[in-house]
Amino acid sequence: MGAVWSALLVGGGLAGALILWLLRGDSGAPGKDGGAEPLKDAPPGEAAAPGGGPGGGGSGGLSPEPSDRELVSKAEHLRESNGHLISESKDLGNLTEAQRLQNVGNAREYVPVGKVPDTHSRANSETSRNQSPESRVGEWRLPKGHETAVKVAGSVAEKLPSSSPLMDRAEAASLAQSAGHEDWEVVSRHSSWGSVGLGGSLEASRLSLNQGMDESRNSLVGGGWEVDGKVVSVKPRQVSIQFKVHYSTSTDVQFIAVTGDHESLGGWNTYIPLHYCKDGLWSHSVFLPADTVVEWKFVLVENKEVTRWEECSNRRLQTGHEDKVVHGWWGIH
């Protein structure tokens, strides 16, 4: 700063001196010429006393009047002062302008880089904003592996109707680029996920599939599963129970049977005949559900009618999970 101020002061002083020299040269030349001619033509007395009148130098000394030289010198002095003022005003103007430029330069130096307005970058941004999407897409350079995806996206964008402003070529290129990073698996139309309609979506088909599976799980009706509107009965696990009893009949038309509260034993309304083996042994196997408790009895049948019941309370049987042999005696638990 000190060097700048000193340079400005020296320059201002030189400019002021030059202006004063020019003003002196312009004002002194006419005065000299005008004063030389009267001195040559004037009498000796007037030349000796230019301020006196025709009567001599005594009267001139009592009432002196300003001479031409004094007027010229005063005019020169005024001009010099005026020139000095003009030069000072010019110097002050130059100093003010230099100080303003220096302040602007300092401000640019101390302002952060991100805050300084850059007209070049602003013009570039306006130019890039005015560019069409086609030119921007053309400037992008994609890897070789994604060129095919970009072409496919371009064909899809061309097939879309022109009235759709939401999908342009730039967006299609970006979608194709993002799709290029993912691995796609081709699934046949008749897959386990079912077919997706043109107006539907994969999410909708998946929801319908899950809903169908839930309905199939919760469609147990009357001990069976409901499949396509039909009830399919599911039989529980069964075990084989072999009933045996010794009884000697009096006639050949008589035989021993078993009945009980389970439907496999007749439900107390009918009976299950036992087969005669030998030595008065009757036996027969019946399938009953596993882990079930049933009540039953032996009966004597003659001419297809129950003629005798065991003389005891109802027998109870726990089927369990394995085959069993129930060997009882008539009327004895």
UniProtKB/Swiss-Prot annotation:
Residues 124-134 have a biased composition (Polar residues). It comes from Rattus norvegicus. Interacts with the ATG8 family proteins GABARAP and GABARAPL1. Interacts with several glycogen-associated proteins, such as GYS2 (liver glycogen synthase), GDE (glycogen debranching enzyme), GBE1 (glycogen branching enzyme 1) and EPM2A (Laforin). Coiled coil: none annotated. Its main location: membrane. One of its GO terms (molecular function) is enzyme binding. GO terms for biological process: glycogen catabolic process; glycophagy; intracellular transport; substrate localization to autophagosome. It is found in: Preautophagosomal structure membrane; Endoplasmic reticulum membrane; Cell membrane, Sarcolemma, T-tubule. Ubiquitinated, which leads to proteasomal degradation. The LIR motif (LC3-interacting region) is required for the interaction with the ATG8 family protein GABARAPL1. A motif (LIR) lies at residues 181-187. Pfam families: CBM_20 (PF00686). Acts as a cargo receptor for glycogen. Delivers its cargo to an autophagic pathway called glycophagy, resulting in the transport of glycogen to lysosomes. This is Starch-binding domain-containing protein 1. PROSITE patterns: CBM20. It is a single-pass type III membrane protein. Residues 1-6 are extracellular. One of its GO terms (cellular component) is membrane. SUPFAM superfamilies: Starch-binding domain-like. Residues 50-61 have a biased composition (Gly residues). Disulfide bonds: none annotated. The chain crosses the membrane at residues 7-23. Keywords: Autophagy, Carbohydrate metabolism, Cell membrane, Endoplasmic reticulum, Glycogen metabolism, Membrane, Phosphoprotein, Signal-anchor, Transmembrane, Transmembrane helix, Ubl conjugation. SMART domains: CBM_2. The modification Phosphoserine is found at S67, S135, S162, S191, S192, S201, S205, S208, S216, S219. Residues 31-73, 106-139 are annotated as: Disordered. Residues 233-332 form the CBM20 domain.
